[in-house]
Each structure stands twice: as structure tokens, then as C-alpha cells.
Amino acid sequence: MRLHGRARRAAVLTGAALLVTGVLAGCDSPSSARPDQAGPGQPDWKRCAAPEGGTEPGDAWRCTTVDVPLDYAKPDGDTIGIALIRKEATRKSERIGSMLFNFGGPGGSGVDILPRAAGSYQKLNTRYDLVGFDPRGVAGSSGVRCRDDKEQEEALRGIDMTPDTPAEEAAFVEDGADFGAGCARLSGTVLPHVGTTNAARDMDAIRRALGDRKLSYFGISYGTELGGTYAHLFPENVGRVVLDAVVDPTADTVGHARNQATGFQRALENYLKDRGQDPEAGTRRIAEMLRRIDGDPLPTSSGRRLNETLALTGIVTPLYSRSSWPQLTQALDEAENSGTGDGLLQLADSYNGRDENGHYDTQSHSQRAISCADTRARPTAAEARALVPGFRELSPVFGPFLAWDTAGWCARWPVEGEHDTPEASAPGAAPILVIGTTGDPATPYEGAQRMADELGEGVGVMLTNEGEGHGSYGGSGCVTSLVDAYFLDGKVPADGRTCS
């Protein structure tokens, strides 16, 4: 279970807005013009069906599928359908074009998430069609499946993700191999083709199908890696692009894990200080609690037991958003003082995509498939074990888990990965707004700085949000007003601007 952003929050968060000053984002606006090259045919928009486990999004939304090559090296071969959802601009006479969204994961379904998050983007929707999509290998776009609910439940209950004995380590390694074998068995046709580079090519096909001369795009979390890859492949087609909660494009598998150990420890310490607790003492207390749970899982009212992995997941979940910190306080109090795991288990279930009936969504399947298609790294259990002491120094709570995760993720994966780190240089592209939040646990602030540098001088425009949480639009009035002015008026903030 790799730490990620599930992008489930759809509420509007408000803050103080600041006046915007800046230069225009070039002479071109990303208006809907004739496609610049041949591509998919005109989309046939129809009423949307309810997503798995969800409800119909409503009459304002329409859905379609755009067919693209399964293998871009064989453009005349088999195709894969990319699922789209759209809500048209409310001021049609002032329409700028389409705005494509990716909310992260990888593995998040834009078709599912965008209607629930659309309230946060009402101002942008006045002049843009809001468009979400399921990247290849996700949900409605030939979503990857690797195991059933029973197998998923047994793995979360029975596999120790921080193994302490040879037997636990052997089971940990075998579970990773079994998961990959399940993906190959159930989704073998699509599995070699679900990487981020292909998803970026799909985005350009979507742009052409929508009739937009330039791509307007809002990428969050993993969506920033996808956006950086798109800018590298198609710099001439970049319109107005915002990358918020940025994945470090210079980090490899171990580097990402190290970044997250640092980021989540920083967020935990900020949480503890906010609660009037000493960060070092609080960290030691939580680490000791996890050690006890590893040996003796906590009971819950459902009859399920809260093991160390689920407890850690329950702690991780509310650190993504400061507004969820009270839930963490209550859940920790239950676990530490009442000896019950209900609160942490509920948070873990939300993170893991488990509903009250025991059904799991498949975001974690898609996430793993996409990540392992991207990265060539295949660390062994022995290599992960050697990382544990150093990672524990970075974070006594999260470090050991993240060290072991480097091996549990893609070892013995049935498909080779594409690269060590993604390419994001985009010479000649229009200015891209890159937003980093200083207290972001999942994609630490430094990754945004590196993305801005990688995009190149005059392309990456750095905006700092001094705050907590994973993602800043809607949570910071300053950031929100700057992003709105950029998308709606083409005003590019000064590089290095800070929102406090």
C-alpha cells in the first residue's frame, strides 16, 4: 500500500483572497478551435450512468468514450476506450474552451471524482467546460483488476507490511508476487500499456477530440506528474496548465519513499504541535503504540482487528488535510486510552476504498499497475531491509513502512518499467503554474521547486502556499484567486510568489 492522494474531498474550502497582479500568459488563449492534426472523431456525449458503487452525477453532466491506440507504436492496431465526463461552461458566450482534470492517485477516476468536486470549480466552470477522464487502466478505461474483495481483505489482515521475522518477510514478498500475477491474469492485455507516457498521449488525443487548439489542464498530486510528462511530450500544445501538490520529477522509487517519510513526519509533528504536544514525545508515543498493535491487534466493534498496517493507514489518512486533524485526535484517543481501533479502522477503510459491505474499489490496483509500468526500479527485500534504519531516523512512525514499501510494490512485477525518473523539461511551452504547500505530507514542498526547475526557465512559475495539507486550491483564498486569474484572464503570477 503506497501512500497516495485519493482525492475524495469535494468540499469548498475558503480563505482570504488577495488582489492579483501579473503579466498575461501570452497572446494565445486556449479557445476551442479546429484540431491541429487528425485524431479521434467527434465525441458522442450521452447521459452518464452511475459509476461502480456511486450515483448518477446529474443532468448537467454528459459522458462519452474516446478510442485511442492501445499501443502507440502500433497506431493501426487494437484500441482502448478512454472514458470522459463533461459539464459545459455556464456562460457559453464567454467560453474559453475545455479544462481537463486529473485528481491524482495514480488510479483516481476523474469520471467519478469531478462531479463530486465540481463545486470547488464553479468560477472556472463559467468559462470552461469541466472535463474529467479515467486514465487508461483506471475504472471505465479498461480498469486494471488484480484480486477480489476476499483476497484484498486477507492481505490487509494477514500480511505484515513491516516484517520482523524471516517468515513475515517471506509472506510479504510472496504477497507482492501474487498481486502481480493476479494483475497479469485478469488484466494482462492492458498491463504493459498503462504507463504515464501513454496516458499523456491520450490527453493529447482528448484535446483534439474536444476541438481545443491548446490544452488547459488542472493536475493535482500524481496529476502533476502526468501534466509534466504532457508538457515534455507536447510543449507546443500547452495552454494554461496548473500543477498543485507536485510529485518530485527528479526522485526515483527510493527517493519518493524518502521524501514521503520526511513529509509525513513533518505533517505529524505539525499536527502534534497544533494539539499542544511535544512533537518528539508524541512521535515516540505513537511509534510505541504501533509496536504494541503489531504484536496484539486492537479489537473493533465490527469484529475485525486493527493491525499495525491498518493503524498506520488510519494515521496517514487525516494528515492529508488539516480539517481532518480532529478525527485523528479522536481515533488516537480511542486506540491509546480505550484500547479500541474503530476510529483508525474507519479512516483506514476510507483510504483503502472499502465500503461498509466489505467491497473494495480498484484504485490501488490501477495505482500499482501504473507506477510499476513507469519505474524500472525493482528493489529486493534485502535492499528494503537495509533502508529501514535510515528511514526510521527520518520518521520513527512512517519510515519503516515506507522503506519496506520500496520492495513490496514492484518486485517480481510481470511488466518492465519505462524509466528511472520521468521527463518534465518543456522548452518553448507557455508558462505553467506550479504550486507547492510547505506542509504537504504526500508530495513535499521541495518537489514543486524541482518541478518548476525541470520545466525550464520561463516555463515553470513557482507559487508557494504556506500551510498544511495536500493541495491548496480551494483551501487558500490567495492561491485560489491567483489560479482563477491565471485560467480566466491569462494573468501569470510573478515567479516565486508566496501565499501566507
Feature-to-residue mapping (PLM):
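Generic alpha-helix initiation/capping and coil-helix boundary signal
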Residues: 4, 8-9, 14, 324, ...
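Alpha/beta-hydrolase-fold enzymes
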Residues: 276-371
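Secretory targeting and sorting signals
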Residues: 1-30, 66, 203
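Gly/Pro-rich cap/lid or specificity-loop segments adjacent to the active site
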Residues: 29-310, 369-371, 375-500
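Feature targets compositionally biased, intrinsically disordered low-complexity regions
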Residues: 4, 14, 21, 25, ...
